[in-house]
Amino acid sequence: MLHVKRTLVTTALPYANGPVHLGHLAGVYLPADLYVRYKRLKGDNIIHIGGSDEHGVPITLTAEKEGISPRDVVDRYHGMNLDAFTKCGISFNYYGRTTSAVHHATAREFFSEIENKGMFTRKTEKQFFDKKANRFLSDRYITGTCPICSNPDANGDQCEQCGTHLSPLELINPKSKLSDATPELRETLHWYFPLGRFQSELESYVQSHDKEWRPNVINYTRTWLKQGLNDRAITRDLSWGIKLPLETPEASGKVLYVWFDAVLGYISFTKEWAAQSGQPELWREYWQDPECRMINFIGKDNVVFHTLMFPAILMAWNKGRKTDLYNLADNVPASEFMNFEGRKFSKSRNYAVYLGDFLEKFPADTLRYCIAMNYPENKDSDFSWLDFQNRTNGELADTLGNFIKRSIDFTNSRFDGKVPCECTPEEWKIPGIDWKETLEKLDQAFEAFHFREATSLGMDIARTANRFLTESEPWKVIKSDREGAAKTMAISLNLCYALALVLYPVIPETANRILAMLGVEKSIDDQLDSGKSCIAQILTPQLEKGHQLRKHSEILFTKIEDAELAPELKKIEDLLALTEEREAKNEAKAMDFSPLISFDEFLKVDLRVATVLDCQKIKKAGKLLKLQLKVGSETRQVLAGIAKHYSPEEMIGKNVILVANLAERTILNEISQGMILAVEGTDGKLFLVEPSGKEINGKKIQ
């Protein structure tokens, strides 16, 4: 088993511009809580730090849309999300806010340290400016047509339809979201962080963890490293945010870019936790003691911010220092996405189940269990209402809950509510469970972040316990062999205790209720003590002969009836109907043919057969492929938004149709010398137009 002096767990900061949904819970906050609760159960010294990201354009956009101040927005959603997390049993030691004075001071301190070392560069660049609103426009304040998929509603930073990361300058027909006016380009000065300067150090850092980190984290990070790291802007022209600690005209109106600001929240929140604990310097033991292990729980869309950018900021601080050096993360267990009824969660389309809404209707532990059993560890998973119902009814109610209630009720009715006899170490083996091996497997699963495996292990014990009680038939045996029935019940009651411990990280409120029904004075929460392992109690029976149970049991899990799910299924039906209606409109709109052109105009379009020689994915563009095409005697580079439909490997050797005389464009610093043709099906899938025949490469389409 792994032992360290102390462990710091951080969780990605959710934007305080809306409520968190089940996708957020599954990807970041529940896995972190499962890990933290297990480590506490082992007696490890561990703290869990989280908080709200309260700066950035999403906040100001929401404020302007609602006609309120950014402060009103973040106050509302910080409180709402913290309340939802608390009700769900997410056990933060501290949940902070990036608008706090401590955080502002910490972020400015980091900026000043790096600025004083002369590491930042200043660059004048062109940025869109809205004359009507009299302000520079950051990327999310601009909308326009995507140059990749022609989506007319692409944002200045990304097209949601094709997933391509964009810059505002790449949009076709850009418009300001503030005034709907066409913005003009003006020069503005920004500070840049020299990410490329730390390329070698970051490569060594990632290499040192390649056996421990998940493959998706390693692969995505190495893709960025392979393509070379560039300077990244750390300032924006905004009024809401952390102002630069510089008294110069150039710094006026500038705030820290949220990617630089937010990750430093982990440090400032730990400082606030230490101060709240009455030991203001205690935070250093978690950030500046090499014997502390740090784990950053994130979703897969935040990988490079935590494997490259945050470490680089800490490296910049550490450069040239002999004291107050910061630790880098030991692991960054990024989850894949959890979808909802087969589709991606989307706040913009309101296709989501919000955590607060869910907890008004169903118990938190049922949700925690269902998500843990569907944890998106190495691939995307799915939350469905029917699966939630089946797991609640079949596994939690019929298996676990049924066993606990039967054991306690029978003991209360036939043995005066007392453990009827001792359960010896030899008898503890009777159900067929190797407790030493179970403890080792449980530890290995949790320490490796295999939460589905750890949860399944607990439910397997519940199934074994249920089967043991059913096959032992104490209600029959007691008629002729009271001692034999007593032995069965002593074992069963101790199994109840062990199940509470094993499943505590997943269903903590239920685990404490089980111990209360068993008449145990201290809840598991009250037994947790740094340096003392509670989970090791499963190795031996804990309930002695004569121990008094609580007189009345309770139903741990109420089964979910079809009628309770009907409103939720109706919501999905309505949302899907709206989606189909929108898609139908788009399809109908697509049948409106373009304006007529003359034959001579058509002849101006030079369509050629090209063959794919090489194909690679583009960094920061989830749906973009870079193709090297052979067109007769020439070689062309073309970017195509088909990565979700064709892999690079299957593209090589294909014949495609190239618009050969299309003016070249620069997209994400890559040249695209033309366009290849594809057809979009009704389900959004793209199909390449693939000509076949011998010796047709370079030939013109007629």
Curated annotation (Swiss-Prot):
- Note the subunit structure: Homodimer.
Per UniProt, residues of the tRNA-binding domain are 601-702
Q: Which family does it belong to?
A: Belongs to the class-I aminoacyl-tRNA synthetase family. MetG type 1 subfamily.
An example GO biological process term is: methionyl-tRNA aminoacylation
Which Pfam family is one of this chain's hits?
A: tRNA_bind
* Keyword Ligase among record annotations: yes
Give residues annotated as binding Zn(2+).
Answer: C146, C149, C159, C162
Gene name, per UniProt, is: metG
* Primary subcellular site in the record, as a coarse category: cytoplasm
Q: What positions does the entry give for ATP binding?
A: K347
Annotated S-S bridges:
none
SUPFAM superfamilies in the record: Anticodon-binding domain of a subclass of class I aminoacyl-tRNA synthetases, Methionyl-tRNA synthetase (MetRS), Zn-domain, Nucleic acid-binding proteins, Nucleotidylyl transferase
Which reactions does this protein catalyse?
A: tRNA(Met) + L-methionine + ATP = L-methionyl-tRNA(Met) + AMP + diphosphate
User: What InterPro entries does this protein map onto?
Assistant: aa-tRNA-synth_I_CS, Anticodon_Met, Met-tRNA-synth_bsu_C, Met-tRNA_ligase_1, Met-tRNA_synth, Methionyl/Leucyl_tRNA_Synth, MetRS_core, MetRS_Zn
Cofactor or coenzyme needed: Zn(2+)
Which stretch carries the motif 'HIGH' region?
A: 14-24
**Where is the motif named 'KMSKS' region mapped on this chain?**
344-348
| Annotated cofactor note | Binds 1 zinc ion per subunit.
Known EC number(s)? 6.1.1.10
> Which compartments does it reside in?
Cytoplasm
PANTHER family, sorted = METHIONINE--TRNA LIGASE, METHIONINE--TRNA LIGASE, CYTOPLASMIC
Q: Which GO terms describe its molecular function?
A: ATP binding; metal ion binding; methionine-tRNA ligase activity; tRNA binding
Q: What is this protein called?
A: Methionine--tRNA ligase
Which keywords has UniProt assigned to this entry? Answer: Aminoacyl-tRNA synthetase, ATP-binding, Cytoplasm, Ligase, Metal-binding, Nucleotide-binding, Protein biosynthesis, RNA-binding, tRNA-binding, Zinc
